[in-house]
C-alpha cells in the first residue's frame, strides 16, 4: 500500500531542504523508511505474502543505496537523517 497523501506531505515537509523539495536523498530515504516500516508490520501478520517480502527487500536495497550516496556527498545530513529515523543503530 502506498502512503496516504497527508502522511507523505508531513514527511516531505520535515525532511525537505527547500520549498518544493521532493526528490532530495533525505526525503526519499524518509519516505522509503515509512513504507518499509508499513511492510514490516504487514508481514508480521501475513507471513506467507512472498510478493510483499520481495518488494520489502527491494525497498531496503534502494534505501541502502541512497544512504550510501548521502554518506558520500553530505555526511552531516546523513548523520542527521539516520538519527531522526532511528536507523543504522
Swiss-Prot record:
Swiss-Prot/TrEMBL keywords: Ribonucleoprotein, Ribosomal protein, RNA-binding, rRNA-binding
Cited InterPro entries: Ribosomal_uS15, Ribosomal_uS15_bac-type, uS15_NS1_RNA-bd_sf
Gene Ontology terms: cellular component: cytosolic small ribosomal subunit
GO molecular function per UniProt: rRNA binding; structural constituent of ribosome
GO aspect biological process, one term: translation
Record Pfam families: Ribosomal_S15
Stored CDD domains: Ribosomal_S15p_S13e
Cystine pairs: none
SUPFAM superfamilies attached to this UniProt entry: S15/NS1 RNA-binding domain
Assembly and interaction partners: Part of the 30S ribosomal subunit. Forms a bridge to the 50S subunit in the 70S ribosome, contacting the 23S rRNA.
PANTHER family with a match to the protein in the record: RIBOSOMAL PROTEIN S15, BACTERIAL AND ORGANELLAR, SMALL RIBOSOMAL SUBUNIT PROTEIN US15M
Function: One of the primary rRNA binding proteins, it binds directly to 16S rRNA where it helps nucleate assembly of the platform of the 30S subunit by binding and bridging several RNA helices of the 16S rRNA. Forms an intersubunit bridge (bridge B4) with the 23S rRNA of the 50S subunit in the ribosome.
Cited NCBIfam families: S15_bact
Family: Belongs to the universal ribosomal protein uS15 family.
Protein name listed in UniProt: Small ribosomal subunit protein uS15
